[in-house]
Amino acid sequence: FVVKAGEEEYLPYGYDTLVAEAEKNDRLYRAYECKNALSIGYTYDSYIPEEKYAKMSTVEKQQALLQGVILSDSTVPETIPEFNDREVPYKLVTGSGCREKDGKLIVTKENAQAKLVFDGLDECETYLITEGVDYEALSPRELISDKKWNKMTLYEQKKVQYENSTWRYWKESQKAYIDVTGQFLDKTISIFTDKYNAYSGRSDFLCNTGYSVKGKKSITLTFENTGVYSYKNMKVVCQPIENIESQTTKLRAESLENVEIKNHELTGNISVSKDKVLVISLPYSKGFQAYVDGQKTELKQANTMYMALELKKGTHEIRITYCTPYLKAGLVLTCAGLLCYICVVLVYKKKRGSKKG
C-alpha cells in the first residue's frame, strides 16, 4: 500500500512494515507491506453459501470472507460466520448554512459542515455508512430565506429572479461531493444522480475513516455543493480488529508452495491435513483449466471473483493453465474464411479467363 510520506494515517490496519521509498515530483512516497497478507493460494476448511453471503451487509461480508470460502456448493462443511461489528449511536450537529429537516440535510452555503458526534470503540476501524443517498440542487431563489428576501431591494430581487430564470435544475443536480473527515483522514464521497450522463445507480456508500487505538469521537461532513442531500439511513459502525490476525494465520497455515508462473501456466504443491478448499487469487475465467496430481479438476468461482479447487487430505501437485476462450475456434474460423476467400478469387479469375478466351 503506497502513501505519501507523513500521511501514514491513510494506511489500513496491518500495513506497518515499510518496504520501499521513492520520490516523484519532489514528493516522497512510501510502500508498506501487510503482516497479515495471504499468499496467492490459501485454504479454507469450511464454506458459506453464495445466497447467504449475498444477504449480508458490506461490513458482514468482509468478516465472512475470513471465516469461510464463498461458493455455490461444496463438499467441506458449511460454517455460520460470527460478526463483532458494532453500530454506535451518534448526535448530528449542523453548522452555519446547513440544517436537518425530515431526514434530509439542506445546505444553503458552499462548504457548510455537519458533525456526527459519538463514542467510538478502541482498537477499531470506524466506518460511516450511508444508504439511499440522493442530491437535488437548490435554485438561486431557494437559497434565500423568505426573511432575507423581504429585506432585499427591488433591484436585488430582480437580479436573483433573472439568475433563477437562467438556472437549469437538471444541469445543476447532476453531481455533488461530500468530504468526510475522521480525526486525520480526509476522504470524498462522490454523488452522481440519474441526471448525470455517467450515472451508475450507486446510492450506498461505506467510508472507512481509518483505524485508531483510541475510539474516535466524531466525523465531520463538509458539503462542497449547496442543495438538498437526502438519505434513507446513515450510521457509524466500529469494526474491532481483534480476530484478524488469528483468522489470517489459519488461512495461511496450509498454503500453495513453490509457486511458479510462466508460459500461461501456474504450478505449485500443497499439503492439507484434511479436506479443504484451495483459493487461487487470480480472477475467475472460463479460460483457466486446473489439474490436481495430473487429473483434470473442476475450477469453481469463489469469493465472488477468485478461483477455487476442492482438495482431499494429503499432498498434491497443482497445475493451472490458461487459454483465451474461443481462441482455437476463432483461429479455425479465420482459416476457413481465408480459404473460402482464396477459392472465390480463383473461381473468379478462372471465369474471367474463360470469357476472354
Predicted regions located by residue number:
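Active-site-proximal, structured, solvent-exposed surfaces of multi-pass membrane proteins
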Residues: 84-357
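A cross-kingdom signal targeting lumenal/periplasmic-facing segments of multi-pass membrane
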Residues: 1-50, 58-63, 67, 71-89, ...
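Short, solvent-exposed cationic patches
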Residues: 54-55, 64-66, 318-321
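Intrinsic-disorder/low-complexity, polar/charged segments
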Residues: 51-53, 57, 240, 262
